[in-house]
């Protein structure tokens, strides 16, 4: 029961021992986040709300919670993928092509509507360990060169603001110095450009709101990469916190 799919609603639920992670495909074909938190047994209760414009000052792409936002359209938030095509275009517009399940892995298939370019979003569920692994595979099916300017593994949505971000920093002889930082409006960026593991920043995030050793919610994630990486933690004007990790 690690992967539960409601095909009628186009909703996908990743169920681990104590947690649920739910997303789906909306009326515009966007992969949208619905829930991440304590386990909900009956995932059929989830519906994909129709995406409607709040006002002309709030574009659809600003208010929607995308699992994998790409560069283009009226997206002013951080994007996971940016590419340059042979004709100079840098805008991606994807369509949903379907899904595959192989054991504990769910693959969401996306395709650009203008170029022969595929993106597959991979989700692996490790039920006993309460872990979800995410990554993306990108394929250029044409004979033309496509330059990838940026790629992150995915975006996480945390339904709170004013969180505390924890990580470690350091230098030679003083590694692993723990620090905390209040997340406010704007972005926190952690990165490494050295090409190897470094003591300056570590590729993970821990976010909480007044959590203790025994109480409270803690959201965390780590990038399975020891070389160049980048991470962004962003608090939006809509009362949530976004997190991305990926290759720098």
Residue ranges and their predicted role:
Residues 5, 10-13, 17, 21, ...:
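Polysaccharide-binding surfaces and accessory modules of carbohydrate-active proteins
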């Amino acid at each position: 029961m690690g992967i539960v799919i409601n095909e009628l609603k186009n909703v996908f639920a990743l169920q681990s021992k104590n947690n649920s992670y739910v997303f789906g495909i909306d009326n515009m074909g966007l992969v949208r986040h619905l829930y991440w938190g304590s386990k909900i047994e009956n995932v059929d209760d989830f519906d994909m709300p129709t995406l409607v414009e709040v006002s002309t000052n709030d574009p659809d792409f600003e208010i929607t919670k995308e699992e994998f936002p790409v560069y283009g359209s009226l997206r002013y938030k951080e994007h996971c993928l940016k590419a340059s095509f042979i004709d100079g275009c840098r805008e991606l517009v994807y369509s949903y092509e379907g899904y595959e399940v192989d054991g504990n892995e769910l693959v969401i298939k996306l395709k650009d509507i203008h170029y022969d370019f595929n993106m597959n979003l991979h989700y692996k569920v490790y039920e006993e360990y309460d872990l979800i692994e995410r990554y993306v595979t990108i394929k250029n099916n044409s004979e033309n060169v496509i330059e990838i300017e940026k790629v992150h593994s995915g975006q996480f949505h945390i339904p709170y603001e004013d969180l505390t971000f924890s990580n470690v920093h350091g230098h030679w002889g003083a590694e692993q110095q723990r620090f905390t930082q209040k997340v406010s409006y704007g972005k926190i960026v952690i990165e490494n450009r050295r090409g190897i593991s470094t003591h300056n920043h570590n590729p993970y995030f821990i976010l909480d709101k007044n959590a203790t050793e025994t109480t409270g919610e803690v959201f965390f994630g780590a990038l399975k990469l020891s070389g160049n990486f980048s991470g962004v933690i962003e608090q939006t004007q809509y009362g949530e916190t976004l997190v991305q990790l990926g290759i720098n």
